[in-house]
Amino acid sequence: MGKIIGIDLGTTNSCVAVLDGGKARVLENAEGDRTTPSIIAYTDDETIVGQPAKRQAVTNPNNTFFAIKRLIGRRFKDDEVQRDVNIMPFKIIQADNGDAWVESRGNKMAPPQVSAEILKKMKKTAEDFLGEEVTEAVITVPAYFNDSQRQATKDAGRIAGLEVKRIINEPTAAALAYGIDKKQGDNIVAVYDLGGGTFDISIIEIDSNDGDQTFEVLATNGDTHLGGEDFDNRLINYLADEFKKEQGLDLRKDPLAMQRLKEAAEKAKIELSSTNQTEVNLPYITADATGPKHLVVKITRAKLESLVEDLIIRTLEPLKVALADADLSVSDINEVILVGGQTRMPKVQEAVTNFFGKEPRKDVNPDEAVAVGAAIQAGVLSGDVKDVLLLDVTPLSLGIETMGSVMTKLIEKNTTIPTKAQQVFSTADDNQSAVTIHVLQGERKQASANKSLGQFNLDGIEPAPRGMPQIEVMFDIDADGILHVSATDKKTGKKQNITIKASSGLSEEEVAQMVRDAEAHAEEDKKFEELVQSRNQADGLVHATKKQVEEAGDALPADDKAKIEAAMSAVEVATKGNDKEAIEKATQELIEASAKLMEIAQAKAQTQGGAQEGAAKQSNATADDVVDAEFEEVKDDKK
């Protein structure tokens, strides 16, 4: 059985870990980094992922996608998506089913399809380390992700060629990473997770007793559209406003300028975590009729803090709700763990310290803890990690729409999963022959104010006065937090059941097609690599041949030289095209045309070899004239 890997699929960065010798190990990617930017770029002939994609973003802003996780499982008309539509350099569009998709070079793509490219890189990183194919993974999601977003994440895994064995909440994974070596006692831990695009707070009880450990999530809360990207955007808007005040030009209309501004803002934000002032200096950011324009703005830490103060305050309300849901007070919390890169900001740490009245722990790596926890959970599933029990919860209440457009809850938020719940409902009208089961997720009483997860009909109900038929609705949430619903007419036994697919979401056929496309691209990628290899070999041969022609000088007959030069030109023409066979044919012809060169090189080598041999013989002859002798020390008393 192959290894199950743990993947933290992040908004800004992603990370992969695997159990190695019983310990979770974070793996380095091909660039030598332990985290990979969650950035994907599409060019004319290839898909670029990670750091290389980030490097080319300035020159290709419309086809470079970042923070795709903020769109996964979302409707185009969602307020959160509409905010992003206006600030992202790439195109966010409405799919036929109402989902938020993206567009690159005329191709419309679903967020799971784009995210799958990051997962493929994580998969390849693990395969390079393990030396074997990887087909199974545990993938983390924000604790406050709804059913649609969890389904979409599983779809991304399938498209990447991974069977997702478990979806695990990010704060829970971080608690696993922190608590796995804490062998005794009972601790209540608050995990404050402020990442690139999402915010979660989870209150988790870790019970360690005689080698057995239980990680029980008591409550969770959060905001799936609040994170480091929002902090960056505040700074980007400030810089754009300052430039407009000074120069009268709006950089927001220039995608290239905005991409440079994004990189500079992110860099400045990071620098201001360790220094009190920094300067954003972007020469030639744009130009008008009067000439090029430069952006130079000094930013203090205090200025940045004032720009994002309300975002930090927004994270505190979910803390209060989570504590209330867990029926705990601040004094009951033993440890506070910070997860996510944005928690490196001193003002965030200060806010958390003030709220909990204690310093957060500094021994948890905020960028790697989630992937480490995912790898530990993978070990639990594969049987490599024993005596660990993980009890997670559903973050939002689940129910159905009943008469008067009311949401009737069947499963309350923060219920431990997996779980089942059932309730009997009836008809609203006389002789009603069918009922529509409309499944909802959320906390509001009004049905329309909650997230619609989908609906289905149970028909064939026997005619009867209203209120008489008995329809039993069963909700079943699996360990991934994904919902299965059934409805049964208790009189006839007729049953209808579905795994909730979001009313949006990808259909089975769409996912299957994307899997096929990914496999086809894998073949294309392989061919592209082979083409590049052939090009590189051809270029290397031309370079070496030119050098040999120069070294041969007049020893190379003119007609041979002409043949070689013609063959080199043919190779150079072939390498500009995309025909691997043509490149290899031209390369072979150059090798054959260079036969005379090889003869000259061999003759020269033999001549040099002969000269060296003669010199060696002369040296040996001189050495033969030397007589070895043993010297005896003569003592004074022997004289």
UniProtKB/Swiss-Prot annotation:
NCBIfam families cross-referenced by the UniProt entry: PRK00290.1, PRK05183.1, prok_dnaK
Family: Belongs to the heat shock protein 70 family.
Region Disordered, annotated ranges: 603-639
UniProt function note: Acts as a chaperone.
CDD domains: ASKHA_NBD_HSP70_DnaK-like
Entries under InterPro entries matching the protein: ATPase_NBD, Chaperone_DnaK, Heat_shock_70_CS, HSP70_C_sf, HSP70_peptide-bd_sf, Hsp_70_fam
Modified residues (Phosphothreonine): T198
Compositional bias annotation for Acidic residues: 625-639
Organism: Shewanella sp. (strain MR-4)
Keyword DNA-binding belongs to the record: no
Protein name, UniProt field: Chaperone protein DnaK
Keyword line: ATP-binding, Chaperone, Nucleotide-binding, Phosphoprotein, Stress response
Database matches in Gene3D superfamilies: 1.20.1270.10, 3.30.420.40, Actin, Chain A, domain 4, Substrate Binding Domain Of DNAk, Chain A, domain 1
